[in-house]
Amino acid sequence: MDLKNLTQEERSELSLIDVAHFILEQRKETILFPELVKEIQAFLGLKDAEIRERLVQFYTDMNIDGNFISLGNNMWGLRAWYPMDAIDEEVQTQTTPKKKRKSDDDDDEEILDDDVDYDDEEIVEELGEEEITLADVLLDEDEDEDDHLPDGIEGDLATVEDDYTDGDYTEDPEDK
């Protein structure tokens, strides 16, 4: 079907898909989507606002229609141009083997050097020069310093009594 001979009124009745198919048949090569849209707009004589309104539906229709194929990077062509075997090959990308990275063995040795060897008596003596006696341990167990506040503060603290000691939690004690 030759769309070039149609009047402007007949062209306005065509769908964007039909015009896209016609343009791709005439060019006989792939085309970027924005370029295809510009050619459709020029062919149909549509304003920018009109083409923007129909653009989303047009893109959806191109994806659903079996006559078009997206070749990646927003390139479109006609599916009839490609045999089925070639389509799968063009869509697949070649994977390149990953480069081997040099291992960071030096870092591991530094970490191992930082570890304390408890079999070496000199290092252990340096780490624990303070001797702890049994009296120190018993003192720590019996008396926690956190339990006692400095003088003067304990007397300033008020004791809060629990008003809910009777087990009735439904009513506020201040309302009684």
UniProtKB/Swiss-Prot annotation:
InterPro entries: Asxl_HARE-HTH, RNAP_delta_N_dom_sf, RpoE. The keyword Transferase applies. Residues 14-81 form the HTH HARE-type domain. The keyword Lyase does not apply. Keywords: DNA-directed RNA polymerase, Nucleotidyltransferase, Transcription, Transferase. GO terms for molecular function: DNA-directed RNA polymerase activity. Residues 91-119, 140-176 are annotated as: Disordered. Pfam families: HARE-HTH. Residues 105-119, 159-176 have a biased composition (Acidic residues). GO terms for cellular component: DNA-directed RNA polymerase complex. GO terms for biological process: DNA-templated transcription; regulation of DNA-templated transcription. Participates in both the initiation and recycling phases of transcription. In the presence of the delta subunit, RNAP displays an increased specificity of transcription, a decreased affinity for nucleic acids, and an increased efficiency of RNA synthesis because of enhanced recycling. RNAP is composed of a core of 2 alpha, a beta and a beta' subunits. The core is associated with a delta subunit and one of several sigma factors. Belongs to the RpoE family. This is Probable DNA-directed RNA polymerase subunit delta. The gene is rpoE.
